[in-house]
Structures are given as C-alpha cells and as structure tokens.
C-alpha cells in the first residue's frame, strides 16, 4: 500500500498551532510581582514588545516564577521593568506544561533562552564559573 492512503495524526503540530493561537490571543500585562495566578503553566516575557524569553512554571507557580523574573530585572542595570510585559497561559497537566514550553521556544526562538537569563544552574556565581551573556549585558546594580 502506498503512503498516500495512510493517515498519521501529527499531534505536535496540532498542539503547537492551538497553543500559539491561544497564547497570542491572551492579553499582555506589565511584568509585576502579582501579575499571574498561583497556578502552573507557560509564559513569555517581552522587552519593548519583542518576545525575549519563554518558560514554564511547573515546580512553582506562574505568580512566583514571574515575580522572580521581575525582581531579577529590577535589580539590573541597562534594563527596567517599564520595558517589560508578559503573557501566560495556565495549564494543569505536567506533560502539557513541558510540551507548551517546548512549543513556545521552538516557535519563537527567544534570545534570552540562549543567554542564561532563566538559569538556576548550580554553582552560578561561584569563583571560576563564567558569567552568562545575560549577566554581562545586564549586570547587577
């Protein structure tokens, strides 16, 4: 039998398309410590209207994760919270949160996802550990 008669549902494409559609329809909010609900999900940060970081809140809540990012940015030079907005979607399932983060990163290729912005790497800041590009561009105050 030829492949033209076979049906294969491409779940990842359908999931990504629906997630991005819902995500882009969600409102943008100023990045503050209380912007999001205490639920799990996915989010993106925008600087001056440009999507710069996509992440997930799984072991913590969207509220805590976005508050952590707001505090980090507020404590840096060359950037301010006035420049920042965010979008988020609440998602209950661990699998869908992980898949959602992957879909956002793959779809948007955010610059800060490659610079160490959201890093929780053990040893960061210790002697002998190189500073991330993000820490170099936006040093602590």
Q: What are the functions of these language-model segments?
A:
Residues 1-52, 56-141:
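Boundary/linker segments flanking structured domains
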């Amino acid at each position: 039998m030829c492949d033209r008669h076979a049906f294969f549902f491409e779940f990842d494409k359908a999931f990504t398309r629906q997630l991005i559609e819902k995500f882009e329809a969600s409102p943008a909010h100023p990045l503050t410590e209380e912007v999001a609900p205490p639920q799990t999900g996915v989010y993106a940060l925008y600087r001056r209207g440009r999507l710069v970081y996509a992440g997930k809140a799984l072991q913590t809540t969207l509220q805590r994760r976005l508050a952590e990012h707001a505090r980090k940015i507020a404590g840096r030079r060359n950037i301010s919270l006035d420049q920042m907005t965010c979008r988020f979607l609440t998602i209950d399932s661990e699998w869908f949160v992980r898949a959602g983060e992957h879909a956002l990163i793959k779809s948007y290729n955010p610059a800060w996802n490659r610079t160490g912005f959201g890093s929780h790497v053990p040893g960061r800041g210790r002697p002998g550990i190189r500073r991330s590009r993000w820490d170099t561009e936006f040093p602590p105050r």
